[in-house]
């Protein structure tokens, strides 16, 4: 079980949005590289990064900030937002990313995702962002008619490293993770699922460690970490203890 601290990039800065709204952005750090190093120093083992501008533009916008992050931390980094082509995937992986997250293109061109998994085994994740139970695309700005599980099942057996499932209706407002929907997805597919959107307190970490959530790879935390609602040491100690028990 992994707790992924999140760095969302808007105009080169670390921000958190409310409900995916770019107009409701709170700046937490103007130096993404320093924030990445701070998370590493706190004991986190992975980093989740999103290029928010890129998600809307359909191409990388905050590339300099991502490069600064990669230079500042030894931890593996996963990146989503605006990655839409095989060349783009290859370019980022060659620059040191551990894995890319494909969201909009997973809806628009699932064949590309399958091909990417063949070319870059273990380095391609799919981001499923849902609003009102339906998949959203283009930086959450457009709704589709696709169901969450319907989309996930398209990639069974393709070699997708993980599915990052975000409930947009809870993202950035500390409402708690949508456990019912998240666990339903985890039970429906064999691909590891990472929960995102709404993680609010240490209670969500404890919930993540319950036996019925064993199929989850982990969860992503943003605002709760930045606001001090979750103590990194306490959270990581809980996860470590749970791993030792399961071992």
Curated annotation (Swiss-Prot):
Q: What is its EC number?
A: 5.3.1.16
Q: Output the InterPro entries linked to this UniProt entry.
A: Aldolase_TIM, His_biosynth, HisA_bact_arch, Isoase_HisA-like, Isoase_HisA-like_bact, RibuloseP-bd_barrel
Tagged with keyword Metal-binding: no
Q: Which GO terms describe its cellular component?
A: cytoplasm
Q: Which residues form the active site?
A: 8 (proton acceptor), 129 (proton donor)
- Provide a GO biological process annotation: L-tryptophan biosynthetic process
UniProt subcellular location: Cytoplasm
Q: Which reaction does it catalyse?
A: 1-(5-phospho-beta-D-ribosyl)-5-[(5-phospho-beta-D-ribosylamino)methylideneamino]imidazole-4-carboxamide = 5-[(5-phospho-1-deoxy-D-ribulos-1-ylimino)methylamino]-1-(5-phospho-beta-D-ribosyl)imidazole-4-carboxamide
What's one GO MF term for it? 1-(5-phosphoribosyl)-5-[(5-phosphoribosylamino)methylideneamino]imidazole-4-carboxamide isomerase activity
Tell me the pathway.
Amino-acid biosynthesis; L-histidine biosynthesis; L-histidine from 5-phospho-alpha-D-ribose 1-diphosphate: step 4/9
The UniProt keywords, alphabetically, are:
Amino-acid biosynthesis, Cytoplasm, Histidine biosynthesis, Isomerase
Which CDD domains does the record cross-reference, listed alphabetically? HisA (cd04732)
**Major location (coarse):** cytoplasm
Q: Which cysteines are joined by disulfide bonds?
A: none
Its family remark reads: Belongs to the HisA/HisF family.
HAMAP family, per this entry? HisA
Stated name of the protein: 1-(5-phosphoribosyl)-5-[(5-phosphoribosylamino)methylideneamino] imidazole-4-carboxamide isomerase
Origin organism of this chain? Answer: Agrobacterium fabrum (strain C58 / ATCC 33970)
Gene behind this chain?
Answer: hisA
């Amino acid at each position: 079980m992994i707790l992924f601290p999140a760095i969302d990039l808007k105009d080169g800065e670390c921000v958190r949005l409310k409900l995916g709204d770019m107009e409701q952005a709170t700046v937490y750090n103007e130096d993404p590289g320093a924030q990445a190093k701070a998370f590493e120093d706190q004991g986190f083992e992975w980093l989740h990064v999103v290029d928010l501008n890129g998600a809307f533009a359909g191409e990388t916008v905050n590339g300099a900030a991502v490069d600064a992050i990669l230079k500042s931390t030894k931890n593996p980094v996963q990146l989503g937002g605006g990655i839409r082509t095989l060349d783009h995937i290859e370019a980022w992986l060659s620059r040191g990313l551990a894995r890319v997250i494909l969201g909009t293109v997973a809806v628009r061109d699932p064949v590309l995702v399958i091909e990417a998994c063949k070319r870059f085994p273990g380095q391609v994740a799919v981001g499923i962002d849902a609003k009102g139970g339906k998949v959203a695309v283009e930086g959450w700005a457009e709704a589709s008619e696709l169901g969450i599980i319907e989309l996930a099942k398209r990639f069974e057996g393709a070699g997708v490293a993980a599915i990052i499932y975000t409930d947009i209706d809870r993202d950035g407002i500390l409402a708690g993770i949508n456990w019912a929907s998240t666990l339903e997805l985890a039970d429906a597919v064999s691909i590891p699922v990472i929960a995102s959107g709404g993680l609010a307190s240490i209670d969500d970490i404890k919930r993540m460690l319950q036996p019925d959530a064993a199929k989850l790879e982990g969860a992503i935390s943003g605002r709760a970490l930045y606001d001090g609602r979750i103590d990194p040491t306490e959270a990581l100690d809980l996860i470590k203890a749970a791993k030792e028990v399961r071992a």
